[in-house]
Amino acid sequence: MTGDLFINGKDAYTTWGVNMGDGFLDAIDGFLSMKSFIENDSRMEHGKRMILSNPKVASREITLRFTLKGDSQEDYRAKRNAFEEELYKGSVNVRVPVLGEQVYKLVYLGKSVSYGMNTARTLCTISAKFDEPNPMDRTV
């Protein structure tokens, strides 16, 4: 709830009624992929040579799930629209205090978005894709 998730320096719950959805922590805190190592697969020798010095981490694309709740239909619509506007800014800095002080510097891709709303029109789930261009840059 309050204080669990911060987006662009704002408390997501108090600002937009947004909480982390299913699998949020697993997705954002998952292991990182490595960039391919430099290889030379020459026909002149058996196997291949690999340069293992100076390994680098690759960018990553993650899907995050959110829940958004309003106190009424009008409150829900206002919060939903404001949250959507925040995502449309492109740059989305996410901090989850239970994972430490690191800030995940993400870019909202606006693709593969799924959305579902309850029949009372006061609650929804949102699943959206983000890119983390440099997963090693998580400083404040």
Kindly label every feature range from the protein language model.
Residues M1-V140:
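Extracellular/virion structural assembly segments
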